[in-house]
Amino acid sequence: ETGVETAFVETVPEGTADFGNYVRDFIEQGFNVIIGTSFGYMDDMEALAEEFPDVVFDHISGYKANGTNFGNSFGRMYEPRYLSGMVAGSATSSNLIGYVAAFPIPEVIRGINAFTLGVLETNPDAQVEVVWTSTWFDPVVEGDSAQALLDKGADVIAMHQDSTAAGEKAEAAGARSVAYNSDMSAHA
């Protein structure tokens, strides 16, 4: 036992008062460290950190910080991205790899850069083309973006999205895919 008391709540929608209400509840219960694990909580956490200067706020995957009680952290997801890029570079026949990506934020860009470096490590002739969807979860937009890349000749589709749509489009076209954030084992 560590002597540290923890509590959590799941499935809190982004962009609603719910997140702030849960945080205030935790603070009233005496919690002095708050960790938010969704990119969409970033602005709310920034405001809450200002409101509660004696509470430490850590935002997973964000890029904002105030230097006192609000910071961010994220795992080294670029490392497996690099490795998956090596596999994609070895797997492509067309030398065009498509990448369906949500938003041009540091987390996503780090992943794309690492993936591309991995591709080039095993196939210096390959190119990675990125399509931005401007959404974390919209299966129609993600699928259409993957299809556009497939139509250009991509035979491997990678993604940084929250649905399986891009991978499903790749599978339907007989292409390979590199998943992220969604269980794609049914399509392997």
Located regions from the model:
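A residue-level marker of the well-folded mature domains of exported/periplasmic proteins
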Residues: E1-A188
